[in-house]
Amino acid sequence: MTSVVVVGTQWGDEGKGKITDFLSSDAEVIARYQGGDNAGHTIVIDNKKFKLHLIPSGIFFPEKISVIGNGVVVNPKSLVKELAYLHEEGVTTDNLRISDRAHVILPYHIKLDQLQEEAKGDNKIGTTIKGIGPAYMDKAARVGIRIADLLDRDIFAERLKTNLAEKNRLFEKMYDSAPIAFDEIFEEYYAYGQEIKKYVTDTSVILNDALDAGKRVLFEGAQGVMLDIDQGTYPFVTSSNPVAGGVTIGSGVGPSKINKVVGVCKAYTSRVGDGPFPTELFDEVGERIREIGHEYGTTTGRPRRVGWFDSVVMRHSRRVSGITNLSLNSIDVLSGLETVKICVAYDLDGKRIDHYPASLEQLKRCKPIYEELPGWSEDITGVRSLEDLPENARNYVRRIGELVGVRISTFSVGPGREQTNILESVWATI
């Protein structure tokens, strides 16, 4: 039994897709356990970029099984579009498996997401308007439609009618918005269901059988710990649990079967959307990092907010996800800076604190306490070992490991597979 979980340790966009793709070469099954098509990940293969939102990164390995677990909310329209995109690029999807227990995102979820966000005005969350939150709301309220329901014409029709009646009352009475007709959804989405039917199965059986047989299983998280609905910067969070604990709920695999948790982070910090961000940069350094790092959302295209590396955030992520190994990305983006900074603690009303506050009001008053290190000017994109890094870059990497309290297993100096350097194989140490 061998399993590794890959989680984002910041606010998403840490490079999880790249690291999952890298670790997938030694895995036999790759599974996604939460989120929806609000999460974008970019994989670079032979200098060609592939952008995915729903399908696991392991799809590029035809001999390996790729799983969309029960904790994922699936927009069938987006999924069919993504499948077509992969087919056009010559990528086979015969190795894809989709949980029959996964919940379905429908047009009324997307409409409700938009109306709710507009109604919040200045207090908006900054969602991707993909219907993720409303779909998880229906799931918790026990009125959601699952993939298994979508495949049964009569059951889908019955449940869609019931849900539309409720949602349309909400649209008309609360939001003064036009209702959605049954015929606008039913045939189109039933057809999507039939198109993906061949991939649908009980994925918990596949995953547990693989683990019991001693196969290597890689679990791929979406978003990041700081967007977790319980452990993140609530309410500026997603509606699911990206933390490693989400694996057990979102994949149907027990906690005793999880061996390693790899936390993925960048050598700086970024986030999309609203919410607290103590180390955010508003100067030319921030603009430089954004441009060199191509910090624009895969899903939204929005410019990402950027800031210095925050070890307070990282220690919080380490604790709540049980991170055993760290994967540090985008070190190359900081090349050329005379000085690099790491936030080591916060100043809250004159008192030093080392933990991340739950209160948004306290977070607003937190000022980062920085440790400054000398930067480096060398081009490091061709570096293939820690020893080959310039001394200042090497010291920066080591200091991050010390402050977070987790050993660094891999570090990356660019987006390509070949630019990921192994310090310690997470598979070999299990």
Curated annotation (Swiss-Prot):
Main subcellular location: cytoplasm
PROSITE patterns per UniProt: ADENYLOSUCCIN_SYN_1, ADENYLOSUCCIN_SYN_2
Cofactor note: Binds 1 Mg(2+) ion per subunit.
Top EC class, one word: ligase
Keywords: Cytoplasm, GTP-binding, Ligase, Magnesium, Metal-binding, Nucleotide-binding, Purine biosynthesis
Binding site for substrate: T298, T299, T300, G301, R302, P303, R304
Record-annotated active site: D13 (proton acceptor), H41 (proton donor)
InterPro entries: Adenylosuccin_syn_GTP-bd (IPR018220), Adenylosuccin_syn_Lys_AS (IPR033128), Adenylosuccinate_synth_dom1 (IPR042109), Adenylosuccinate_synth_dom2 (IPR042110), Adenylosuccinate_synth_dom3 (IPR042111), Adenylosuccinate_synthetase (IPR001114), P-loop_NTPase (IPR027417)
Binding positions for IMP per the UniProt entry: D13, E14, G15, K16, N38, A39, G40, H41, T128, R142, Q223, T238, R302
GO biological process: 'de novo' AMP biosynthetic process; IMP metabolic process
Catalyzed chemical reaction(s): IMP + L-aspartate + GTP = N(6)-(1,2-dicarboxyethyl)-AMP + GDP + phosphate + 2 H(+)
This protein's pathway: Purine metabolism; AMP biosynthesis via de novo pathway; AMP from IMP: step 1/2
Residues that bind Mg(2+): D13, G40
Entry cofactors: Mg(2+)
E.C. no: 6.3.4.4
Cell location: Cytoplasm
The family this protein is said to belong to: Belongs to the adenylosuccinate synthetase family.
Subunit structure and binding partners: Homodimer.
Function: Plays an important role in the de novo pathway of purine nucleotide biosynthesis. Catalyzes the first committed step in the biosynthesis of AMP from IMP.
Listed name of the protein: Adenylosuccinate synthetase
Organism: Streptococcus equi subsp. equi (strain 4047)
